[in-house]
Amino acid sequence: MLRYARTVRFSQVGNSVRTSSGSFGPIRTIFISSHDRKSPSHSLSPISNLPNHNDSSTERARKTLDDDFQRKIKYDELKTRKRIEDLRALTKKVSQLVKQKQELSKIAKIPVPSDEIKKLKSVEDVVKVTKSQHVATVRTNIPEPETVTTHIEKEESEFVMEQNAFIVPATPIPEEIAKRLGLALRYLVSETNQNWTLVLDQLKADRGFKDLPYTTVVDFLTKIPASELQKVIPKVDQLLKEAKIPKTAKILNLYIASLASGSAVPNQVIQILENYCKRIRKLKKGKLPKRTCEVMVQAYGKNGNINRIQDLLSEMKLHKIEISGMALTNILATCVYKARDHKQAVEIFDTMRFQKEVYKPGTRAYQDIIVSYVNNDDIEKAIDIYREMITEKIEPNQQIMVALARGCASREAFKFKSWDFIFEINRNNWTPTLPTYEYMLYLSSRDGDLALTRALYSRLLKDNTVSLRSFNFLLLAYSKARLSDDLGEPFLINADEKGRKFRFNVIDRSGISDPTNQFPFLPFNELTTKEQIMAESSAIWAHACLNNSELINSESTTSYLNIASERGTLSDFIDRMEGSTFLDEKINNVLSGVVIEEPDVVVETTDFLTQKSSAHEKYDETSIVKSPILKSIQSKRTPRVSLTYVVALKAAGKFNNYNFANRIWQERGKFRKTETFKKLPRTEKDKLDFQFATQMVRTLTELNLLEDALAVLKSTEYQFRWTWKELDVLKSAAIRQGNTNVAQTVRSIARRAQLTYEGKIRRKDYKRYVMQRGY
């Protein structure tokens, strides 16, 4: 049959298809037969109504229809089988629940030891009453003595004290000791309520460890939890001494493990552990067992003593004792959390990673090294380690996600990934812990999202889980809050749809706008003015002083002052500084022999040092940004620290008040002479001085005193490691004002610092290097 090609254009209008000679619609090539060409108006009929002839296309269509019919039948069959399997599984589950309920009902009918004891006591009372009545020959309805005796024998046959005194034991105790304990086992009612002191007292009353095999005694000691064993070590020693059982290395190892089981091990406990180790060395011919070494590594780690860990590792190497992966993990945790030695932590982790056959790092090791990288502001490497975990198919945990979120928030390039890691916790169906909620507060407060921070904090209030960390993050949110008139990027959490929904739901369900809320939140979901921020932060501070004074310390006070520096006025800042801090007057009276007399200067009324330090007299009755309660709580004040003066200098620069700045750095000089500052390590003193000097340079620059800022810089050039991070503000201001002398001097100081501290090569040294190499 002849076939030919015909090209037409189609456009669809409604449900009909028509050809068009216009320019719209795709070009399609349709092959039609001569039969179709002769009858162009013939409508397409269903496949079932096709003419029955030997056309191949018709056969293929019928075959396709049959295949589709068979496919639907198979699909329905599979669907039916799936339903049958679900019904079977449901039936099985129901039967298991019924069976479990029957077993629980049987267990509920089992008498507990106290019930049996009550029955026994009631029988004894009946015996006493019967005997007395028998002597008096008074006839009553009480059974005869013979009947009572028979009843007693029956009760004793049904109730055997040794078998039923502790029906469901919390700890499987050796049988020989269980017989001696008797009713004392009832003090071990559950895993969470154990009184081993009374158990040992009862055991001592019944021969103690006498005539018991050594293995039985050791087995009994291993059943005592480590946290409980450290409390009863003196009693155990006495029982061992009375039974003349020597304290072997195995028993001493139990002592060591129990004393090292706490979250921190003080120096006094370390001394006791080292004495135990000396006794073990005598028993083992000068060599510590591997188990003892591993426990001591853990103990030194909790004590933060890296040097003793290194000595112990050298001893293990000398005696050819191979260190285990668990010991390396403990050392890694010590370097990260106690010693904060990032370089050593990286070396240990690399050792574990490149010797996977022996020290394969697990989830805990990856968690510790990721936290170390985040703490050292290397989020790129932390993300690389996380990707390595995924490649090695090592299961991450919630702490890793929180650490990565915290690290991403501190970097401009990664800040949009911070909430993604938080939402990963929800994808893995993990229950958020308190640190997770706290760092959600941190992310929102750092981003200036005050509404979300207040909503999350209200959730912690409902759960009664407010901590010092979460309180500080709330205060941080007030100082960084974005107001309605602040222009900038949208909140990070609004970067995707999931974040927007999460933020809306948390704020909507917080209940902050409820006027009956007991916490002093203003009844608005969002604060829109600086006055609202100042008023609410003041009310929250007063509430903490009255009801939760443990939240008040130097760190939270500094955050409280920073709110006034960012959102208030200079008078607000001075009022808060006077009302919440004081200068510790414990100053060393032995000063230098030279006394410089300052000339009398006229200062403004805002100078808080020339006025009487009294929050009551400074209180403004008409102020709407101060809580009235603060008028009567003058005692809730903390000593000023170095960071207090840094924040005060920042406020002086922002409000352009030189006199206030001058008095601040004079008082900071007095603060350096206090006992609190003198007791600090040298490195900490240098760190705080550099922090204050950096703020001095910034404040003087904001006051347009560029020469004074340069003088501070030149006087401390060789004392501190200045970088462009601290010097860029002064250099930029000098360039804007056209002060080339200051700009050039700042560049010279930065260049010399790079040569001295950063290892930058000099130009002439580079030329000499090229001449010697010849290229």
Curated annotation (Swiss-Prot):
Residues 41-55 have a biased composition (Polar residues). It holds the Pfam family PPR_long. It comes from the Eukaryota. Residues 1-18 form a transit peptide. Residues 56-65 have a biased composition (Basic and acidic residues). One of its GO terms (biological process) is RNA splicing. It is found in: Mitochondrion. The keyword Cytoplasm does not apply. PPR repeats lie at residues 289-323, 324-355, 362-396, 397-432, 433-467. Residues 35-65 are annotated as: Disordered. InterPro entries: Pentatricopeptide_rpt, PROP1-like_PPR_dom, TPR-like_helical_dom_sf. Keywords: Mitochondrion, mRNA processing, mRNA splicing, Repeat, Transit peptide. GO terms for cellular component: mitochondrion. Regulates mitochondrial small subunit maturation by controlling 15S rRNA 5'-end processing. Localizes to the 5' precursor of the 15S rRNA in a position that is subsequently occupied by mS47 in the mature yeast mtSSU. Uses structure and sequence-specific RNA recognition, binding to a single-stranded region of the precursor and specifically recognizing bases -6 to -1. The exchange of Ccm1 for mS47 is coupled to the irreversible removal of precursor rRNA that is accompanied by conformational changes of the mitoribosomal proteins uS5m and mS26. Belongs to the CCM1 family. PANTHER family: OS03G0856100 PROTEIN, PENTACOTRIPEPTIDE-REPEAT REGION OF PRORP DOMAIN-CONTAINING PROTEIN. Binds to mitochondrial small subunit 15S rRNA. Involved in mitochondrial-nuclear incompatibility, a major determinant in reproductive isolation between species, through hybrid incompatibility of Ccm1 and its interacting partner 15S rRNA between yeast species. This is Mitochondrial 15S rRNA processing factor CCM1.
